[in-house]
Amino acid sequence: MEDNLEKRVEDWVSTRIGVQYTSAKERAMRLLEEAVELAQAENITWNQAVAQIHYVYGRSKGEPEQEAGGVAVCLLGWCAAHKTTFQEIALREIERIEAKPLNEIRGSLARKQDADLVHGEESAEHA
């Protein structure tokens, strides 16, 4: 069952959250959320995070697949720094979310919707 992690996660999102949340843009928003949470867990300050966002948005927009490759390389490097593997952390998280009750998943989604973090409107400044 762990052979195709992408399909496993896609199926989980589709069946537990909803097909409308499988779009590339929605997945990028969730990736941003998780990346910020990881940075926060690693003691990256608010000011450092905001400075990084200003730096990135001050440059030309990249190609999604190349940027996703960069995310993958950075995550692999983070795994190496923590003496773990991507497979290990990914499987542990997939098993954790698959075990979550549906009402807990939907509650988390509702909180994100209330905060306008799901399907939010783009800022004209950075569109």
For each predicted feature, which ranges?
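Flexible "arm" and connector segments at domain edges
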Residues: 1-68, 72-127
